[in-house]
């Protein structure tokens, strides 16, 4: 985006209810007829990179954004009607409740569009949504008007009206805090009493006789099954709250035919669920507090270690309350947990046992973390990595993640809009992969679009250039390119291939920090270098952490790759090169663990194969789309 261009705060649209597979390119095709677009961003999960189901489309002109809102709202993209509204960055407007109404008892057939069409007669609508789950509409929704007056008109006219033969309730939106406060106030003045655990021989008359002494009752009912047999619970509704409270105080816990009877305030289902959830969360928090700092996570366990052996190894450090090796199908999963009675004992065990060799493997010992803590830690690590990302040297690090937004250069309204070219149509020269498939002929600058990241598939990345004439966006493929070093792990390469590989390896491997002046340019002339011998994994000394740490950083991944490639080649001969390149992105400590643990390696390889297959399927689908023709402005 051109930083000098004027900003239009109301030229940004929120696009919701998106299908998981909708990309920036699809949204550009959809919205570009409305006017010049500055940027498009599909919001994604920070870790998995999966779509969160909504996006932002930033137009150059507010009039174009308004045109898109008026003409494209609820249009179908990949089988789902999308919901469009103005992007409101200030949350205070959304949370204030001004102009927001609540509608319930809706017919299942009423969707977002039908609700919008019904209420748009009362004023300008900012957002409109029917709440749905996997089974469809949940029977209620919300409409947010631009003004409070429009909301009040809608409440006056529509409350109690029939929509699709159902009488709907329309009222002012109330926050959860307001609803809970009202619920608490009503609970203090209850008149309906719930009774259970009184046996099978109870009927309405006996229950009325039992509770009638506390005051006049409006209704008494024992719940029965289809055969008329008591279900063991019932309800008594009193006229006054004082009578109901007295019945609860005196009858709760009273012995009835050898059973302790329960008498309490009758609750709605949502109240019971809320209370049970609160109790569960409290129990969970108590358990977390009790085990905070005393529960240890132990991984890289030898297959022969069981619960008793694990307890025996950690027993010298204190009192163990539990020791468990996680199993699957009768076999160890390679990790377990040890819980001590005090944090001091656990800390001592971590200090002494982390890195110690037990049986045949060095243990990894650390304080156990909850899933939420691990996710927060991973998110923090990811953000730190992203913050340190600079313009990459393609020879050194070809796996940099792409930007998650789709930016268009600012285009003057008088000019025609540039044509859109789908990903893959314009060839991009990229270095060849470091780990090529067996027998492939390497070339230092061949077009290699096959290697991708081992995470979820990334969206295509768009960048633009600004020539003097008509501006045409240049599309860069989201496929990742692999490393340029082309050493193969199979048979000895041909002379030409070996020469090409040697020439690329001879290029100095430098990384530059951002802002460094007079950066040295890479010498593109092939330099004379001695041909490296073929790597033979069999008979090599096992790679250890100390050996890896002693090696220069640029050689560490090569040492790991030399040992990973033959193992992966035995599983997937045709994909070994790509999979090796994908796995080399993982931390070195994890790669060492995979070399020692065949199960862990196979699990990661299976994940990589799944990613490759998903990527190939998406590529094939894209080719089919491209074959139908390229849309132009």
Curated annotation (Swiss-Prot):
Tissue-specificity statement: Detected in the adult brain, testis, lung, stomach and heart. Expressed in the epithelial and fiber cells of the lens, and in the epithelial and endothelial cells of the cornea. In the retina, present in the inner but not outer segment of the photoreceptor.
Keywords in alphabetical order: Cytoplasm, mRNA processing, Protein biosynthesis, Repeat, RNA-binding, Translation regulation
GO terms under biological process: mRNA processing; mRNA stabilization; negative regulation of nuclear-transcribed mRNA poly(A) tail shortening; positive regulation of nuclear-transcribed mRNA catabolic process, deadenylation-dependent decay; positive regulation of nuclear-transcribed mRNA poly(A) tail shortening; regulation of translation; regulatory ncRNA-mediated gene silencing; translation
Gene3D superfamilies: 3.30.70.330, c-terminal domain of poly(a) binding protein
Superkingdom per UniProt: Eukaryota
Localization, UniProt: Cytoplasm
InterPro entries attached to this UniProt entry: Nucleotide-bd_a/b_plait_sf, PABP-dom, PABP_1234, PABP_HYD_C, PABP_RRM1, RBD_domain_sf, RRM2_I_PABPs, RRM_dom
Pfam families in alphabetical order: MLLE, RRM_1
Residues in RRM domain copies: 11-89, 99-175, 191-268, 294-370
Assembly and interaction partners: The C-terminus self-associates, interacts with dazl and interacts with the C-terminus of epabp independently of RNA. RRM 1 and RRM 2 interact with both eif4g1 and paip1, and the C-terminus also interacts with paip1. Interaction with eif4g1 is necessary for translation of mRNAs required for oocyte maturation. Interacts with the translation termination factor sup35/erf3.
Entry domain remark: RRM4, together with the C- and N-terminal regions, is sufficient for RNA-binding. RRM 1 has no RNA-binding activity itself, but improves discrimination between poly(A) and poly(U) in combination with the other repeats.
Family note: Belongs to the polyadenylate-binding protein type-1 family.
NCBIfam families, sorted: PABP-1234
UniProt name for this protein: Polyadenylate-binding protein 1-A
Species: Xenopus laevis (African clawed frog)
Gene that specifies this protein: pabpc1-a
